[in-house]
């Protein structure tokens, strides 16, 4: 039978070389996450950013934490936070525009009763009444006046454990922090000529750009990173910030060495990376309340931008690795909301962005050394996605955020629709950010990460500015170009190829002749005969079979076999421990997984439907293990697969393993299985439908789920190629003998061929419907 190919793949797919395993582990990483919501389900993350520090050769990348600097008087740049780190009580900072705003901040130690103290503010002795009732936290207080001879008033106190304070000039205002750590927030004072306000810092301080305000707030609330609190960190003068040094231009080509035929060129480029995520949201069959998958997909994006007066055309491909698989199950009823799998990227994930532009740097990117890059970080936030239910309020997946931080660069190759491009792959590590994501109107809430439902949040693209530098060996004659070959890391976008191949496979279903299909389904297809139609040589067929086996090892069918083997082992050990007791939980459960529910005889109709559906999903494996003379669904699916492989014009060695594995999982999703006991037939399908009837008259009788579970264990399981409704329709319209009925019930291929050769419309329609279910 044609289903021999699946049994061979299951048998042989576990022999894999160690080098292949290592390569696969390095290229693919998926993590299943089980979430148990509770008061301690989520925790905050430490505000530590272990980075390389400032890189002075970039015109676009600036450090997150610049400093520390020594106490001084200067005019801070606009839109930059001064993060002040005092060590003792007293005046921390003061600033004025010399017209209508004099603002100073003082620090008061813990546990200070109301007392009058003298402070020197703007060169004058001032008496101020202060207090701090906190036993552990230090208190920052703003002192402000609007005229030179006016009196100071106190504003915006901040109770702080880390003993850090922030001041910034921005948008006609002076911003500070108030409240109590770890929940301090920003506040502001309006002022004129804000850009001319000079600041005098009486303690060490850092400078943080406004774009990194979230980091500044984390430092205020939680303290500086541990590396900043060591004796190796020495404050320097603020004038060091103004040291003039030579920076590379946005576009720079430098000849490193040159011979008659070859030369080494160093390319320095400022780049703007724009990218977006793509996703796939797949709805399951049924009543419309269930989704099978919400996943990330590779996304291509082409754009133009201006670099040093030159318009640059760029192309990016964004992909993700280290996916976390979540799921939500609202219940077992057909109208309960279910998401079988939705993907989330978190701190254990990586984002890869392959970048190419039309500059000279990418013309000869084959032999490359000294590759380096530095990029800014970017925040990616999730939007709202509504799951449209037929009735009731829509569940909405909302929120979620991650920030991307540069973690390295390698060479790669992008495969677009028209051309292959040697490019750079920028790797980004992730950290989770606020807000968390949730699914409204469900129990899912307060989870961190970026889900795949709407990762772009209505934005056309995300943008990162940065710079890269590399040295490339190129021909001395600039008119020559080295050919494009696979670089260090090859990124082949199989999604596009597989999408086109799936469409071709689905269209080929209409070109299959049923009589030939039945003959092909009866042939013992092995791996060589299955794949030999693609390549003529034996070695090529062997290589393809090996690749298919490697991929097939990870299929859901192979995983089901592994699970079943464990169940049978448990059942065997249970029986050996107590041979005198025949337990449904130790025998039938290995095939049916209904050990806990078959004991209740008074079950409802919906409960029986659930049980029979659960049993039917496992009967494919039982049928494989106890092969009969009848034809089964896998014979038909394998024959259809063989026919389509022979007819396909787009199949290759890269896509074949994916297609064969998908076919084993997705061909003929709606299957029915039957067991025969004397003159009774019990039949159940994977969609929960069940029938019990007599062979002689096709008269329906009550369905006994306990009897069905027992027969499944002890009797052969038969694929209902011609299901009960088709049989009853055939008998009512044409009339069939008892022997013909038994042969059709046993899925006898000879009888099937006879009906097809007689052009029986009922049988032909049934076989055609099975062929049309062979879709990817």
UniProtKB/Swiss-Prot annotation:
- Keyword Coiled coil among record annotations: yes
Q: Does the keyword Coiled coil apply?
A: yes
Q: Where is this motif: YGL motif?
A: 448-450
Q: According to the UniProt entry, where does the motif KID motif sit in this chain?
A: 644-646
Coiled-coil segments: 484-518
Q: Which residues form the signal peptide?
A: none
UniProt cross-references to Gene3D superfamilies, sorted A to Z = 1.20.5.170, 2.60.120.200
Region: Spike foot, residue numbers: 510-776
* Residues of the site described as Binding to sialic acid: 101, 190
GO CC terms, sorted: host cell endoplasmic reticulum-Golgi intermediate compartment; host cell plasma membrane; host cell rough endoplasmic reticulum; host cytoskeleton; membrane; viral outer capsid
> Disulfide connectivity?
203-216, 318-380
Matching Pfam families: Rota_VP4_MID (PF17477), VP4_haemagglut (PF00426), VP4_helical (PF17478)
Site keyed Cleavage: positions: 231-232, 241-242, 247-248
- Give GO terms for biological process: permeabilization of host organelle membrane involved in viral entry into host cell; virion attachment to host cell
Chain intervals for the UniProt region annotation (Spike body and stalk (antigen domain)): 248-479
Q: Which UniProt keywords apply?
A: Capsid protein, Coiled coil, Disulfide bond, Hemagglutinin, Host cell membrane, Host cytoplasm, Host cytoskeleton, Host endoplasmic reticulum, Host membrane, Host-virus interaction, Membrane, Outer capsid protein, Viral attachment to host cell, Viral penetration into host cytoplasm, Viral penetration via permeabilization of host membrane, Virion, Virus entry into host cell
Annotated region (Hydrophobic) at: 389-409
Region Spike head, annotated ranges:
65-224
> The motif DGE motif: which residues?
308-310
**SUPFAM superfamilies according to UniProt:** Concanavalin A-like lectins/glucanases, VP4 membrane interaction domain
Q: Which family does it belong to?
A: Belongs to the rotavirus VP4 family.
Recite the other comments.
In group A rotaviruses, VP4 defines the P serotype.
Protein name (Swiss-Prot/TrEMBL) = Outer capsid protein VP4
């Amino acid at each position: 039978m044609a289903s021999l190919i699946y049994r061979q793949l299951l048998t042989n797919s576990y022999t894999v070389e160690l080098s292949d395993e290592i390569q696969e582990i390095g290229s693919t990483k998926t993590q299943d996450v089980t979430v148990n919501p509770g008061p301690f389900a989520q925790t905050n993350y430490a505000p530590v950013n272990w980075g390389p520090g400032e890189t002075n050769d970039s015109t676009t990348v600036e450090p997150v934490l610049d400093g520390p600097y020594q106490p001084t008087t200067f005019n801070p740049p606009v839109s930059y936070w001064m993060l002040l780190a005092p060590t003792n009580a007293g005046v921390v900072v003061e600033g004025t525009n010399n017209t209508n705003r004099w603002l100073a901040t003082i620090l008061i130690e813990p546990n200070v009763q109301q007392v009058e103290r003298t402070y020197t503010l703007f060169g004058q002795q001032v008496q101020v009444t202060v207090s701090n009732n906190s036993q552990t936290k230090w208190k920052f207080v703003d002192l402000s006046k609007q005229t030179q001879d006016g009196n100071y008033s106190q504003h915006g106190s901040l109770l702080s454990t880390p003993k850090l304070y922030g001041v910034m000039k921005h948008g006609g205002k002076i911003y500070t922090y108030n409240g109590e750590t770890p929940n301090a927030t920003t506040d502001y004072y309006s002022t004129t000529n804000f850009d001319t306000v000079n600041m005098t810092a009486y303690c060490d301080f850092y400078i943080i750009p406004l774009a990194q305000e979230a980091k500044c707030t984390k430092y205020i609330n939680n303290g500086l990173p541990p590396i900043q609190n060591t004796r190796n960190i020495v404050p320097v003068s603020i004038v060091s910030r103004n040291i003039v040094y030579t920076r590379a231009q946005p576009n720079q080509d430098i000849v490193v060495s040159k011979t008659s035929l070859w030369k080494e060129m160093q390319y320095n480029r400022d780049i703007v990376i724009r990218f977006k995520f793509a996703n796939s949201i797949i709805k399951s069959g049924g009543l419309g309340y269930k989704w099978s998958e919400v996943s990330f997909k590779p996304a291509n994006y082409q754009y133009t931008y201006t670099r040093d007066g030159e318009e640059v055309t760029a192309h990016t491909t964004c992909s993700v690795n280290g996916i976390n698989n979540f799921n939500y199950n609202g219940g077992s009823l057909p109208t309960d909301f279910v998401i079988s799998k939705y993907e989330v990227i978190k701190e254990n994930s990586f984002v890869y962005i392959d970048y190419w532009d039309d500059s000279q740097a990418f013309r000869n990117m084959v032999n490359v050394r000294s590759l380096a890059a530095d990029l800014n970080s970017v925040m990616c936030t999730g939007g709202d996605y509504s799951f449209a239910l037929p009735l009731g309020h829509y569940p909405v997946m909302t929120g979620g955020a991650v920030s991307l931080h540069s973690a390295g660069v390698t060479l790669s190759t992008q495969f677009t629709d028209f051309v292959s491009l040697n490019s750079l792959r920028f790797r980004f590590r992730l950290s989770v950010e606020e807000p968390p994501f949730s699914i409204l109107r469900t129990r899912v809430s307060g989870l961190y990460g970026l889900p795949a439902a709407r990762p772009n949040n209505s934005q056309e693209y995300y943008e990162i500015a940065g710079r890269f530098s590399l040295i490339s060996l190129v021909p001395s004659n600039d008119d020559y170009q080295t050919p494009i070959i696979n670089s260090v890391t090859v990124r082949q976008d199989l999604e596009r190829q597989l999408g086109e191949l799936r469409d071709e496979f689905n269209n080929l279903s209409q070109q299959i002749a049923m009589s030939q299909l039945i003959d092909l389904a009866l042939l013992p297809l092995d791996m060589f005969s299955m794949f030999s139609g693609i390549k003529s040589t034996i070695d090529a067929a062997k290589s393809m079979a090996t690749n298919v086996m490697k991929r097939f090892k990870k299929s859901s069918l192979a995983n089901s076999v592994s699970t079943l083997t464990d169940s049978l082992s448990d059942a065997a050990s249970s029986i050996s421990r107590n041979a005198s007791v025949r337990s449904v939980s130790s025998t039938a459960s290995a095939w049916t997984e209904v050990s806990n529910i078959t004991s209740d005889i008074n079950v409802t109709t919906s409960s029986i439907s659930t049980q029979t559906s659960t049993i039917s999903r496992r009967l494919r494996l039982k049928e494989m293990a106890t092969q009969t003379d009848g034809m089964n669904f896998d014979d038909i699916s394998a024959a259809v697969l063989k026919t389509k492989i022979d007819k396909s014009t787009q199949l290759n060695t890269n896509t074949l393993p994916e297609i064969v594995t998908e076919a084993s999982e997705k061909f003929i999703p709606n299957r029915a299985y039957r067991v025969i006991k004397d003159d009774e037939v019990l039949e159940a399908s994977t969609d929960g439908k069940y029938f019990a009837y007599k062979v002689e008259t096709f008269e329906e009788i009550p369905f006994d789920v306990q009897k069905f579970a027992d027969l499944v264990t002890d009797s052969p399981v038969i694929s209902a190629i011609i299901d009960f409704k088709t049989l009853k329709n055939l008998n009512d319209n044409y009339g069939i003998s008892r022997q013909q009925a038994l042969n059709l019930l046993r899925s006898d291929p000879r009888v099937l061929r006879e009906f097809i050769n007689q052009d029986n419309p009922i049988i032909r329609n049934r076989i055609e419907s099975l062929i049309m279910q062979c879709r990817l």
